[in-house]
Regions:
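N-terminal export signals
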Residues: 6-27
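Extracytoplasmic substrate-binding proteins
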Residues: 33, 40-43, 50-52, 143-229, ...
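Short helix-initiation/N-cap motifs at beta->coil->alpha
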Residues: 46, 110-122, 256-265
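Structural recognition of the beta-strand scaffold that forms the well-ordered cores
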Residues: 61-63, 82-84, 134-137, 159-161, ...
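A short, structured surface patch at a secondary-structure boundary
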Residues: 63, 68-128, 133-140, 147
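Solvent-exposed loop/turn segments at secondary-structure junctions
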Residues: 66-69, 87-90, 133-134, 139-143, ...
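His/Asp/Glu-enriched short active-site or ligand-binding loop at hydrolase and phosphoryl-transfer sites
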Residues: 234-259, 327
């Protein structure tokens, strides 16, 4: 994640929510706000908008981050959900969709109010469902400003949360908003503390390392198109690019003008990456040789697909190929309060001795089992070519 600010430097939005970010005397700096479960609730969302919720919401539309919503709220929070962005959820996050709908079959009966993987919102459908609260992401908010005004005039409280920017303060604020909104402060706080303390420890260990071991050249690519085409890479402001920036890896796409775009084969080869990372998921598209990772994906299948990328034409002389510094990661697991485990994993990839005690994949699965025991979290989330 990009931000390295401590809790004492968090935005006023955190204080306005009235939750304790850290120990070490932070409690004394917080305003005297109502306890959880008391209303009205007044706070500032990630778009710095003051939001007032006058009574406990009973009807909620979740237009983004349903996995985070359930991690914080637990299975009981699903009873409040009257609308979801269901369009293309199954085709763009197939593994996640299968796991969550198997555990909670009722999800499939919840009306769809737009696209899971785009910013399209169906205003008429939202109004017809009469929600008390609409939870949306930042890009949805930006793309639907006029619709948001219409919805708020109709009495719907719109709350903007964000896990895309990979900023610690947004992850924490969004999770605490969910915890307070759903009466699950303890669960939200536990997830936040794991994230905050985990990233702080990662930063501490990396800062103690000599500069000579940092900034190894790295190429990260989303493998949804298969080895025959080059998928997106990310600059330092978003997703994997932000993670690589944080751990001081030398991403060859770090300074790209666009947040995400595909690099050419010639450029990748010319930069001779020492480490290659392929992002996978389970996309329901026609690219049968796509990189598959995440929920429900068997390890041998993921490894075979990763080897397909390693065997690309003209890649045989890349340093990463020669030294087997070739890895797979689950793209679908990003944009979540638990995605700091991928920062930990990549820190271990780049600095194995400094993180030899870390077991991020096992810890990620354990977190799912602890906070959402109804789902089956088995799958392949982090992978090295050396396992083959």
């Amino acid at each position: 994640m990009i931000s390295r600010r401590t809790v004492l430097q968090f935005s006023g939005a955190l204080s306005a929510l009235g939750l304790i970010p850290f120990a070490h005397g932070a409690e004394a700096q917080l305003p005297d706000l109502p306890l959880a479960g008391t209303w009205p609730l007044v706070f500032t969302d990630v778009e710095s908008r003051k939001v007032t919720i006058r009574e406990e919401p009973k009807r909620i539309i979740v237009a983004n981050y349903i996995a985070n919503y359930l991690l914080v709220g637990g299975s009981g929070a699903l009873q409040k959900v009257v609308g979801l962005t269901q369009d293309h959820w199954e085709s763009t996050r197939t593994g996640e969709y299968r796991v969550f709908t198997k555990a909670f079959p009722g999800i499939t009966q919840i009306p769809s109010i737009g696209g899971y993987h785009d910013d399209i919102l169906n205003t008429e459908r939202i109004l017809s469902l009469k929600p008390d609260v609409l939870l949306i992401g930042r890009t949805q908010f930006a793309a639907n400003s006029q619709r948001v005004n219409l919805l708020e005039r109709a009495g719907i409280r719109v709350i903007v949360i964000d896990y895309h920017a990979m900023k610690l303060e947004n992850h924490v604020l969004s999770t605490r908003i969910l915890g307070r909104l759903l009466g699950r402060d303890d669960a939200g706080e536990a997830l936040c503390r794991e994230c905050i303390e985990g990233l702080s420890e990662i930063d501490r260990r990396i800062s103690a390392l000599p500069s000579s071991v940092k900034h190894r050249t790295c190429y990260m690519e989303l493998g949804n198109l298969g080895p025959g085409q080059y998928g997106n890479s990310y600059n330092a402001t978003i997703l994997w690019g932000a993670i690589l920036k944080r751990i001081e890896a030398g991403s060859i796409s770090e300074k790209n003008a666009e947040p995400y775009s595909a690099l050419t084969r010639e450029f990748v080869i010319s930069r001779a990456p020492e480490v290659v990372i392929i992002g996978g998921s389970l996309w329901g598209n026609d690219h049968a040789d796509q990189m598959r990772m995440g929920f429900t994906v068997e390890r041998p299948d993921a490894l075979k697909r990763l080897q397909g990328f390693r065997n690309r034409p003209l890649w045989q002389n890349l340093p990463a190929v020669k030294t087997n510094e070739f890895y797979g990661v689950d793209h679908g697991s990003l944009r979540s309060i638990v995605d700091w485990r991928f920062t930990q994993y990549l820190a271990k990839v780049f600095y194995p001795e400094a993180f030899k005690d870390a077991e991020p994949e096992a810890a990620l699965v354990a977190t799912y089992r602890r906070h959402l025991p109804e789902i089956d979290p088995r799958g392949t989330f982090m992978l090295s070519i050396r396992e083959g």
